[in-house]
């Protein structure tokens, strides 16, 4: 389990990445977390490369997926203080910037994947 705190609209919000998060996300939103993270990261990267703002807006579906992922990870980190409804959680913020929050979430997942890979390599050595 990995945790990271991010300041959002003047409030510190903790996010948690663990093996349970993809399952929680799938159960709550009926979507694949990793596929959605890749799609969102691609949209943000694409927008950053384009100069024409009109043709480079991030699709609303991607923004919604991002909010859903952030919500699941925040609720997983702090179930006592994160409301059971995503709309109630989002209402707490005046702004919720994908450019501020997404890098922290991606970093958590990259760190989580590295930890799993190292554990798998160590298991292979022990079993081998």
What are these model-predicted stretches?
Residues 1-12, 32-64, 76-128:
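Charged interaction scaffolds used for protein-protein
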